[in-house]
């Protein structure tokens, strides 16, 4: 893919060659804003359409360097861009909360919770993803990344929206740490045969299929915990938007 040199300040393509930099790279002069710039990938103007394309690729199991090759941006620019994308994700994860009365919620709200293994830098540095899902709408209502302790279970429970904590019935596997964290009247621990956590387990598979850094044997693993959490949150926020778009208004 060939990208024309555009002014990084105004985006204009009305430029002319203006000698070379001390490193031998072609220098350009913008006729519109009169700024000088060199034809490096990080100085190319990235349109809104191209940025939207990159956001989609971030959710399609493609490594960062693969995105650079496919779209024609520099790794330096892409790293700055993903930090901005991750920072823009809302803490509420774009969850659409249920409407209606408490009398309806207490009978209809069903949720599932599960945990999933991942790592940062090396497999010895385990990072467990704790997830909670609305079993009806398939929205991910909360997540937490940490160890596999009771404290992480508490962190997940604290992140669950209040309406679910107060009224939903939560199905989990029989991992002991859930007991005492999720109130007994709201919690049902089940066996595999009960198939009450199928939806959240299927979402775990979706994560591994769609995020390259979560593949068990991958060269695209996370190097920083902040980006690891950010990538997961970024995917969940967009996933929830897709799910809420299918819900009745």
Residue ranges of predicted features:
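Residue-level recognition of single "structural anchor" positions
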Residues: 1-249
């Amino acid at each position: 893919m060939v990208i024309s040199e555009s002014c990084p300040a105004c985006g204009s393509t009305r430029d002319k060659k203006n000698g070379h930099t001390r490193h031998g790279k072609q220098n350009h002069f913008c006729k519109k804003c009169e700024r000088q710039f060199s034809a490096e990938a990080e100085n190319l103007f990235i349109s809104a359409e191209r940025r939207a394309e990159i956001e989609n690729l971030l959710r399609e199991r493609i490594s960062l360097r693969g995105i650079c090759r496919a779209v024609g941006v520099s790794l330096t620019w892409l790293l700055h861009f993903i930090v901005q994308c991750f920072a823009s994700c809302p803490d509420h994860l774009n969850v659409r909360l249920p409407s209606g009365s408490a009398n309806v919620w207490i009978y209809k709200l069903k949720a599932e919770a599960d945990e999933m293994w991942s790592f940062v830098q090396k497999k010895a540095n385990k990072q467990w993803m704790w997830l909670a899902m609305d079993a009806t709408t398939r929205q991910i209502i909360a997540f937490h990344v940490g160890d596999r302790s009771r404290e992480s279970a508490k962190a997940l429970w604290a992140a669950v929206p209040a309406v679910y904590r107060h009224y939903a019935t939560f199905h989990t596997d029989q991992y002991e740490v859930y007991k005492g964290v999720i109130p007994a009247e709201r919690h049902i621990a089940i066996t595999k045969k009960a198939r009450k956590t199928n939806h959240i387990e299927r979402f775990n598979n979706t994560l591994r299929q769609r995020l390259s850094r979560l593949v068990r044997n991958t060269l695209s693993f996370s190097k920083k915990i902040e980006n690891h959490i950010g990538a997961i949150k970024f995917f969940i926020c967009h996933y929830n938007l897709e799910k809420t778009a299918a819900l009745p208004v």
